From Swiss-Prot:
Domain of life: Eukaryota
GO cellular component terms listed in the entry, alphabetical order: chloroplast; small ribosomal subunit
InterPro entries linked: Ribosomal_uS14, Ribosomal_uS14_bac/plastid
Disulfide bonds: none
Gene Ontology BP, a term: translation
GO molecular function, one term: structural constituent of ribosome
This protein's name: Small ribosomal subunit protein uS14c
Chief subcellular location: plastid
Gene: rps14
Keywords in alphabetical order: Chloroplast, Plastid, Ribonucleoprotein, Ribosomal protein, RNA-binding, rRNA-binding
Record flagged with keyword Ribosomal protein: yes
PANTHER family in UniProt: 30S RIBOSOMAL PROTEIN S14, SMALL RIBOSOMAL SUBUNIT PROTEIN US14M
Assembly description: Part of the 30S ribosomal subunit.
Length: 100
């Protein structure tokens, strides 16, 4: 189980990312369209003034139940440990064991 403060920190980052998403996208689009170097620098300065945690690259996908940051399956939002436990208990509909 991950520390609660880490999970809260990740939630805070998600909120910041959602808040600044349109601003960051529009700024990046402007940078691509503008040809003047001085204007690009000005837009880049504006982009850098946004909070560091608002960047989408700082987000980490975590397990929904345990908060584990690694080995998390996107389709389920669960880590491999919990996924296997749920699979063995028959809680995942449509999941079957492979045999070849």
């Amino acid at each position: 189980m991950a520390k609660k403060c880490w999970i809260q920190r990740e939630k805070k980052r998600q909120k910041l990312e959602q808040k600044y998403r349109l601003i960051r996208r529009s700024s990046k689009k402007e940078i691509r369209e503008v040809t003047s170097l001085s204007e690009k620098w000005e837009i880049q300065r504006k982009l850098q003034s946004s909070p560091r945690n608002s960047a989408p690259t700082r987000l980490r996908r975590r397990c929904f139940s345990t908060g584990r940051p690694r080995a998390t399956y996107r389709d389920f939002g669960l880590s491999r440990h919990i996924l296997l436990k749920m699979f063995r208990a028959g809680l995942l509909p449509g999941a079957t064991r492979s045999s070849w």
